[in-house]
Amino acid sequence: MSCTIEKILTDAKTLLERLREHDAAAESLVDQSAALHRRVAAMREAGTALPDQYQEDASDMKDMSKYKPHILLSQENTQIRDLQQENRELWISLEEHQDALELIMSKYRKQMLQLMVAKKAVDAEPVLKAHQSHSAEIESQIDRICEMGEVMRKAVQMDDDQFCKIQEKLAQLELENKELRELLSISSESLQARKENSMDTASQAIK
């Protein structure tokens, strides 16, 4: 009986050490998730500033379209796609952190169930109190992660909507650029025709 109680106490001590490790892992995941959240917030601010920049520089872009419009539009389009892709990668990383926390809690509950069964042979009240404290703390951290996840879902949705609007603006600018090129081509042809007519008239007058 003495050996059995000693073994149970040893197991309880091992469980407490694992709980501390799990708590440290959960804290690390929360810190990483908070960093991801800050990055997404910064990207949202950058994405929100894009429409204002397009409105302020609309006339400049029309002037620039006379020179290298296709290259400029392609560069802007590539930057937007890169931002959207990075947002999606951040969201995937957050989901992985949530899955890791759920796995930690699952193992934690299993260990505590084993400890509660062992409680029949020895009083494990201090360990159970530690379980309640750690469980509440980890549950709170999971709630925080879920809240961050919801914020990031909304941020990704807003980024998608913003991307569609910017795509429409780019398409409109490309269409305007095409029309300007056509007008320029027509004007050049008309000018050339007038020039040729003038030369023919002058030639006939000399004769």
Swiss-Prot record:
GO BP annotations, alphabetical order: negative regulation of hippo signaling
Keyword rRNA-binding: no
Coiled coil: 70-102, 162-193
GO terms for cellular component: cytoplasm; FAR/SIN/STRIPAK complex
UniProt subcellular location: Cytoplasm
MF terms in GO: protein-macromolecule adaptor activity
Matches recorded under Pfam families: SIKE (PF05769)
Keyword line: Coiled coil, Cytoplasm
Quaternary organization: Interacts with IKBKE and TBK1 via its coiled coil region. Interaction with TBK1 is disrupted upon viral infection or TLR3 stimulation. Interacts with CDC42BPB. Interacts with SIKE1 which mediates association with the STRIPAK core complex composed of PP2A catalytic and scaffolding subunits, the striatins (PP2A regulatory subunits), the striatin-associated proteins MOB4, STRIP1 and STRIP2, PDCD10 and members of the STE20 kinases, such as STK24 and STK26.
Family in the record: Belongs to the SIKE family.
Role according to the record: Physiological suppressor of IKK-epsilon and TBK1 that plays an inhibitory role in virus- and TLR3-triggered IRF3. Inhibits TLR3-mediated activation of interferon-stimulated response elements (ISRE) and the IFN-beta promoter. May act by disrupting the interactions of IKBKE or TBK1 with TICAM1/TRIF, IRF3 and RIGI. Does not inhibit NF-kappa-B activation pathways. Associates with the striatin-interacting phosphatase and kinase (STRIPAK) core complex, forming the extended (SIKE1:SLMAP)STRIPAK complex.
Protein name: Suppressor of IKBKE 1
Gene that this sequence comes from: SIKE1
